[in-house]
Amino acid sequence: MEPVSMDKPFMYFDEIDDELEYEPESVNETPKKLPHQGQLKLLLGELFFLSKLQRHGILDGSTIVYIGSAPGTHIKYLRDHFMSMGLVIKWMLIDGRTHDPILEGLRDVILITKFVDEAYIRQLKKQLYPSRVILISDVRSKRGQKEPTTQDLLSNYSLQNIMVSVLKPAASSLKWRCPFPDQWIKDFYVPHGNEMLQPFAPSYSAEMRLLSIYSGTPIRLKCITQQDSSKYEKKMYYLNKIIRNRIIINFDYSNQEYDFFHMYHMLKTVYSNKSFTSNKSKVLHFHQSIFRFLKIPITNTEKIHHEPTQRKVPSKNTMLKSRNTKKSVRGNKQGRRT
């Protein structure tokens, strides 16, 4: 891992300031993974998104329709957090797979075991009227293989476009990963939105969340081309290969790895009904409560490889001035492209 100073993480795709040509051999690297990392990634992104809606006065009184929600373990944390803030929210969780039993028996949570298609979305629209809808989509292919094909992605994005156009949500968070240029089939459309980057995504994941707040005007779509695909691949590879393998030395926190730095800046935007002396103490509270909920061990900064062994210093009170130089130190590299 490379020790560097950074003022803030890249929160959105358009902030990534460099590119790197994709190296296929990266798929052979051993990924570094936390327990329940997928649920952690979803929880942080959705907590950030819903807190933004809370700030805009959109969340209270809404119905959150979450399509592709199973197993949804992390949703219990979100539900409990916003309930503790006094917000009235209904949750409608829809997936053809089984949900975590932790979500059963909650009077404000409806569990529906069903894979969604256009006909069902239109039926759902009638059921939801006149509710204010917040849409979260984590749809993925029903195929057996682990990685979706380009055709799977195009089908998913077509279905998400239907969700947005039919349900007319006040806001949405959609799953979004551009197909890779060497697997390109055709140009396609997605809604306009902010492309949010995700801490604790798999090591070489190019997946983002497409966040939108709608103002009642017609939904605007943008065309994605193969040229765009090349840009997405190079920028996301740079993010994963270079940026996410950094230790942020000016980040005053127990774990200075980049993903924790990214998480910190997300969690500091979250509201709480508790009083804290600083942003750091608030973030630490949420960090620890989320990790406890998901049963993830609390870790400190990973030791940098080739770090010199510390030696005893003479008892004489001497100090060396910092030479303020930056050294590139290589450490564990991560995973695979998804």
UniProtKB/Swiss-Prot annotation:
The gene is OPG102. Residues 305-338 are annotated as: Disordered. Belongs to the class I-like SAM-binding methyltransferase superfamily. Poxvirus/kinetoplastid 2'-O-MTase family. It holds the Pfam family PARP_regulatory. This is Cap-specific mRNA (nucleoside-2'-O-)-methyltransferase. The lineage of its organism: Viruses, Varidnaviria, Bamfordvirae, Nucleocytoviricota, Pokkesviricetes. Keywords: Elongation factor, Methyltransferase, mRNA capping, mRNA processing, Protein biosynthesis, S-adenosyl-L-methionine, Transcription, Transferase, Virion. InterPro entries: mRNA_MeTrfase-like, Pox/kineto_cap_MeTfrase, Poxvir_cap_MeTfrase, SAM-dependent_MTases_sf. GO terms for cellular component: virion component.
